[in-house]
Each structure stands twice: as C-alpha cells, then as structure tokens.
Amino acid sequence: MKHPIHVTSEIGELQTVLLKRPGKEVENLTPDYLQQLLFDDIPYLPIIQKEHDYFAQTLRNRGVEVLYLEKLAAEALVDKKLREEFVDRILKEGQADVNVAHQTLKEYLLSFSNEELIQKIMGGVRKNEIETSKKTHLYELMEDHYPFYLDPMPNLYFTRDPAASVGDGLTINKMREPARRRESLFMEYIIKYHPRFEKHNVPIWLDRDYKFPIEGGDELILNEETIAIGVSARTSAKAIERLAKNLFSRQNKIKKVLAIEIPKCRAFMHLDTVFTMVDYDKFTIHPAIQGPKGNMNIYILEKGSDEETLKITHRTSLMEALKEVLGLSELVLIPCGGGDVIASAREQWNDGSNTLAIAPGVVVTYDRNYVSNTLLREHGIEVIEVLSSELSRGRGGPRCMSMPIVRKDI
C-alpha cells in the first residue's frame, strides 16, 4: 500500500478503522475509583462486548476493514528487548505501586505471551495476583486498600483519542488525564514496529512527548486543506498552535486550522461530542455550545511569515466560519435532540451528536438517540443504528469508539 494512513476528510468512504474490544479492564472498575478512571458507571462486560461486536460487524457489512488495537500491539512486540522496553515504559508512566518491586511486576508481565501481556496491561494488575516476599518494611506492613499495582485502562475502547489520522500522517497524543496517559503508548509502538506501518515512515505531526495535551476527539478533518480542533476540557490551545505550525512547515496540503472553543465540562468533553460532519454541507451540533445569538469563539489559523508565525483570524459565527473555509454558500447545522431543551441535553449526554460518517451522507449512531436520528433522516442522511445500552455508559459514541486509518478522498 502506498500510504498505510490516509484520511483527508470526515466523510470520505471509510476503508480501514481501528477499534478496541472492551475487555477485563471494564470489570476492574469499582464505585470507589470511577472518578479516578473517568467513568460514571460500570458497564456489564458480556453485553458491552456484544454491543461492540455488533458495531464492528456493522462496519464490516459496509465493506470496512476492522483492525483491533490489542492485536496490532501484540504483533508489534515481537522483539524481546522491545517487549522489555515497552513494559518498563508502561510501569513508569502508569506509576505502578512502588510497594512492590518494579522488577517483580516486570517479570510477572513478561511471563505472558504477547497477546496475554497486552490484555494484562490493559486490564490492570491486582495486588492479589502477585506473591511478594516477606514484609519487613514499615510501608509494606501498613494496610493499603488500593487494589491495583497497575491501574486498568477502561477508556481504551475509545480509540479516537490517543491518536488521530491527519492526511498521510497522524498525531500521537499526550492525554490530559493521568488515567489515560498510557493509552497513546500503544499507538507509538504500533506505528514504529508493526509490519503494516514500520517501513512507511509515517509522519508524526505531533508526538506524545509534547508538554501540552491534545486528544483525537477534538481533531476533525473537514477536507484536504482544512482541519478543525476543539479548544476543550481535554485539548490545549498551545497544543493546537504547535500542531498547526508543524503541519504548515512539514506538508503543503493542509492550509487552515479552525480552533473552535467549546465549554470546558465533562458533558462537552471533546469537540466531537457536540459537533460532527455528516455530509458535504451538513453537520450535527449541540445547541448549548453556542451563545444566545449563535455566537462562539472560532479562530482560523494560517501560515504566517515564517515557520514560527501564524496568521490568526477571529470569527464569532460557526456557520459563517465553516462556509468561509469550506467554500460553501449554504450549509445546515442539525441540532442534537431537535433543539428541544430536554431531548437535546439527554441525547447529547448519550452522544447524540457523536456520529461516525462511513460515507458522505451515511452515518452510524446509537439507537437510543431517536430524536436526533429521526432529524438526521429528515435531512436526507442514511442512519445506521447500533446497540448502545452498555457502550454509552462510557460517555462516548460511534465516532469516539473508532479511529479511521484509511478513507477514500472526496
């Protein structure tokens, strides 16, 4: 293949996508640690897996190649030294409990096959799994009720956030919250060492070592020349500025970056929870991100006089800013929940705006958001509904659960 990663729009026909099937990490959630691990509730594993399998099969039925993060990660770690390096970094970044010797935990993890190793790291390591030597130190004798040496990673089924495909390259992201920080490490090793990617020198527009956070749920590819990025609870304006400078200096296709400011709260976690593209001239939107007169802060970033300078233009109308950068005379913003104050809040909480376009005018949505789905159909959009009772407990929808790897150009 010429380019193992190629995404130049939000709506081009989806050809290859990366998913993560929910696993043991979901069962390692408990009420005491929900907030720390960024969950509001505990999904029921057998049903969330059934729903995720239905989602994956829905994509396959439309001709999409489905890849799995856990499988690619296991296939990337064929070298013994690479496995050890990966485990060392996971333990360091996961701030594994220092009351057990680092080497003991490392040896335990390395005793598994590659597939089991990845599942164990993702699922977390409980303290009752490892026998430690006789307790001789005070810190060892002190009672500790925290159950994990290595925390589970229940947010991993939202593959959209740790990395994002942009053109023929990608961003490998620094996640804002400590509970998700390790997630992008999997993608770093996959891109560097998996046979599908390693020989292609895939451009990394921004890597996970950059000091300010950015997450894929805030990165939307509007067309070949324009991307939109949310300034949100999870993505920093400084990271957006750095990414824009890197893009403008290292490639010549993307010419504009829209920085769209949204309220910084859990309900509006990323831009794609309140705004997604569903057709050439149609978008879903949660009305609450706009002011009383539809006003909001949008900044158009373009290349400046040199590599470290940007031209920044302020706009206050999302509709007008989109028309300007997309070269459209008209476009439609479809309100989540039909704009009804109750329905829009309820359906946005269950990701009514978080659509996954698999072709122009064809989207995958959660079945529970019936008001928004009906409105999409009334606007000529083909809506493919998927099961959502347990998947939605993680506060992410079909777009959140998928990382496009290859789309056809539009």
Curated annotation (Swiss-Prot):
Leader sequence residues: none
Is Acyltransferase among this UniProt entry's keywords?
no
Quote the InterPro entries the UniProt record gives. Answer: Arg_deiminase (IPR003876)
Q: Which pathway is this protein assigned to? A: Amino-acid degradation; L-arginine degradation via ADI pathway; carbamoyl phosphate from L-arginine: step 1/2
Question: Which reactions appear under catalytic activity for this entry?
Answer: L-arginine + H2O = L-citrulline + NH4(+)
Question: Which GO MF terms does the UniProt record name?
Answer: arginine deiminase activity
Name where it's found.
Answer: Cytoplasm
Q: Which GO terms describe its cellular component?
A: cytoplasm
- Keyword tags: Arginine metabolism, Cytoplasm, Hydrolase
* Example GO BP: arginine deiminase pathway
Active-site residues per Swiss-Prot or TrEMBL entry: C400 (amidino-cysteine intermediate)
Family assignment from sequence similarity: Belongs to the arginine deiminase family.
Task: Provide the protein name.
Answer: Arginine deiminase
- The gene designation is arcA
